[in-house]
């Protein structure tokens, strides 16, 4: 069981590090490029694609959110891969993996492969946190005197 736990930590940490690096590989699109790209998907059957484009482009156009997300993915992925900081890395990654899963659940419901992939990442993250429940259960269940 311990080897599976280590493999899950390394897999999730590596995946987050890779995702964080990818946030910095492409240049930020100009606002006019986003508008031109969005205009291609105005048909009713392409509403999901339009929502995805506008959502991701909006995050990139803020000037900071996309970079902060990339830095957090890198940092928390590294924390997850280091033995002593694995629990805190998993805890900090929980909202990020939840967000990624919900993004794919609501904006890409037809892409089953990515939905399963992000669901597995979220489940691994939940599993890593649950495995360390002795560290946090006292915060939820207080014993009566």
What are these regions (language model features)?
Residues 1-41, 60, 67, 82-145:
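Extended, low-polarity transmembrane helix blocks
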Residues 47-57:
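Juxtamembrane membrane-water interface segments that cap and precede transmembrane helices
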Residues 74-81:
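Generic transmembrane alpha-helix motif of multi-pass integral membrane proteins
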């Amino acid at each position: 069981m311990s080897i599976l736990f280590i493999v899950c930590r390394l897999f999730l940490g590596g995946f987050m590090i890779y995702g964080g690096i990818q946030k910095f590989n492409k240049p930020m699109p100009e606002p006019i490029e986003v508008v031109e790209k969005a205009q291609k998907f105005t048909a009713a059957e392409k509403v999901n694609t339009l929502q995805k484009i506008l959502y991701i482009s909006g995050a990139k156009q803020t000037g900071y959110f996309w970079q902060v997300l990339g830095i957090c993915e890198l940092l928390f992925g590294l924390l997850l891969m280091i033995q002593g900081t694995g629990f805190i890395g998993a805890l900090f990654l929980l909202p990020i993996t939840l967000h990624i899963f919900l993004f794919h659940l609501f904006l890409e419901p037809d892409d089953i492969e990515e939905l399963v992939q992000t669901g597995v990442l979220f489940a691994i993250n939940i599993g890593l946190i649950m495995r360390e429940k002795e560290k946090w259960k006292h915060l939820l269940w207080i014993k009566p005197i």
